Structure formats: structure tokens, C-alpha cells
Amino acid sequence: AGFYPYTPLHLRSLGLEHASAWMSLGQITEIIAMFALGGLLVRWRLKWIFAAGLTLGVVRFALSALDTRAGLITGILLHGASFTLVLITAQIYVDQRVDPAWRGRAQALLSLVNGGFGNMLGYLGTGGWFALCTASGTTRWPAFWGGLSAAMAAVLVFFLLSYRGRSTGLSPAPAPPAS
């Protein structure tokens, strides 16, 4: 949740105006990642696609922590791919792994967690972290983004150690009902 509210502030602090235009660069890589996702799904397990998205997120925040224009813009470019590989893969996971009778509820819960409670807690947490990294109107961007990168790295390690899934990416299409 730290990307959307604080990247524009960091862009301005680096002398880059028109934050919306710079932020839209992430949409380009998001679209590319969506096209690539189909190929990844037949070659990689969902675990590794999700882990790749989390890894891109760690790198995105680490690059932003460099406090340079190039680092921040590269981080923005990585955001689109990270977003797709994490959030879209999570939706695919629910679609593939949850019993059809429960799938609608599971997708609704995923939306509530991602767009509701998760977003709210993320914004509150990053807001508190931002306040801790800001003194006298000056933000210590390396500390801010570095902290988010470390937190995301911890999530990545937890995910890699705890996730147990199937040995294949997508499950085969269900057989048509017998007539």
C-alpha cells in the first residue's frame, strides 16, 4: 500500500513533476506481464509465479530506496509486473484450487482482503512508517523504501517456507458432463 501514496511524493522530491504520467509507466509492464502470464502458467507452478511477483516487489522497493531518479523509475516499471504476478496469480489460484461450490465466496473474500481490510491496514501501516521516516518535513526515502523492501522480503521467505501446493501450474479443464 506504500507504492501509490508515497511514490508521487518521492518523484516530486527528486524533481520529477507530473507524477501520474510517471506512475503510468507501471501499467505498461503490467500489460506485458498479463500477456506473459499465460505462457508462465503452463511452464511454472503457481508457487513460483507468485514468488517471482513478490521478488519483483522486493527489488522494486530496494531500487526506490536508492533515492535516485533511475532507481525510482525502474521500481515503477517493476511494479506492474509485480502487481500482475501476485494479484492475478492469487485470483487464478482461487479459481483453480477452490471447490466450485465455494469459489464465488472465496473470490469475494480475496477481493475483500486485497481491496478492503488489507488495503486499509497497508495504508495505516505505511502511513505510520512514513511518519517515522519523516522529520521536519524531510523524508528519509532510503529508510522508508528499505523498510518496505525488508518487510516484503520477510513475506517472500515466509511464503516460500510455508506454501505447499500441487506439482503443476494449472489443473486440466474439467471433463464435460456425461449425457
Predicted segments — roles?
Residues 1-24:
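Helix-loop boundary and gating motifs at the non-cytosolic
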Residues 48-63:
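Structural signature of the two symmetry-related core transmembrane helices
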Residues 144-179:
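Multi-pass alpha-helical transporter architecture, strongest
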Residues 32-46, 130-131:
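Helix-to-loop junctions at the C-terminal end of transmembrane segments
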Residues 17, 98-113:
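Loop-to-transmembrane helix entry/capping segments in MFS-fold secondary transporters
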Residues 63-76:
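Helix-loop junctions at membrane interfaces in 12-TM secondary transporters
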Residues 127-152:
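A membrane-interface helix-boundary motif in multi-pass transporters
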Residues 85-99:
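Intracellular juxtamembrane helix-capping segments at the cytosolic ends
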